[in-house]
Amino acid sequence: MADSKHQVIFCNDSPKRVLVSVIKTTPIKPRTTADSLMPTSPGFSDFMVYPWRWGENAHNVTLGPGSGSGAASPTRTSSSPAEADPLSCPEHLKDGIRRGRPRADTVRELINEGENSTSRIRCNICNRVFPREKSLQAHKRTHTGERPYLCDYPDCGKAFVQSGQLKTHQRLHTGEKPFVCSEKACGSRFTHANRHCAKHPYARLKREEPTGGPGKSQGADNKAVAEWLTKYWQTREQRSPVPGKAKPQNKSPLEDQEQQDPLDFLPSDEGEEEEQEEEKNAPSGGVVTARRRLQEQRERLHGALALIELANNLSA
């Protein structure tokens, strides 16, 4: 054909002509009803790679047609573009599967979901819904500009919306780096739990409180800073659990898990506040590893229970 030539684009800043490439336009094949009924495999993402994240994405999985009586296998049906896009799925946005602030491209979906949701925990300004009242109160501060958590470090004066943000910020003053690379003989320490070791990017970070007391800021020359650090570490010691004393547990972890709401295991939208409270009280050594493995088992079990519930709802 005479029209199938190389496309030439003129640059605004230069008179030179740049040869780009041959652009082939292929008509989009319309999706038929038979294609929409065929089960398809879910995308290759973190959901498929990491089993401990099954609980986060279990409500995104649907069962293909005809699999209710047979062997149930998790599939995604793409009967419509709205269902193919996970961000437009109401279930994906129902309880918030990510901690902290949402991505900029998901805010509009959250607002639209709030307009059609029956949840009573709703922001009266932007109609966004939340899984719990505490999350709503923290969210409203983004509209009012309220920052009730003030850093009392001398000459700092920074304020934060959530208490967890204040605790993370104060590590910059104290020099704390409680998160250590789990790789043996690495020794890389970090201030935040969401960092990754450059040498071992796939290794997880574990919480490890320093045993030597205050860090590099201990010998501060400023008297006010020294007093603040002393008060800070005294408060930390009072909150830290006494070694050798554990809270009595009348129930096993599995029994306690079965009686809790399965949605409690999903990450909430409350930032890092609750997560840091648990990490602060966590012991060190092998107990941390055992607790992490137990949490992974809980999330795997939650993912399996969610799939079973979806299968029951589909068959009903």
Swiss-Prot record:
InterPro entries: Znf_C2H2_sf, Znf_C2H2_type. GO terms for molecular function: DNA-binding transcription factor activity; RNA polymerase II cis-regulatory region sequence-specific DNA binding; zinc ion binding. Residues 61-97, 234-294 are annotated as: Disordered. Pfam families: zf-C2H2, zf-C2H2_6. Residues 70-82 have a biased composition (Low complexity). It is found in: Nucleus. One of its GO terms (cellular component) is nucleus. It comes from the Eukaryota. A zinc finger (C2H2-type) spans 121-143, 149-173. GO terms for biological process: regulation of transcription by RNA polymerase II. Residues 289-313 form a coiled coil. Residues 255-278 have a biased composition (Acidic residues). Keywords: Activator, Coiled coil, DNA-binding, Metal-binding, Nucleus, Repeat, Transcription, Transcription regulation, Zinc, Zinc-finger. PANTHER family: TRANSCRIPTIONAL REPRESSOR PROTEIN YY, ZINC FINGER PROTEIN 367. Belongs to the krueppel C2H2-type zinc-finger protein family. This is Zinc finger protein 367. It comes from Danio rerio (Zebrafish). The gene is znf367.
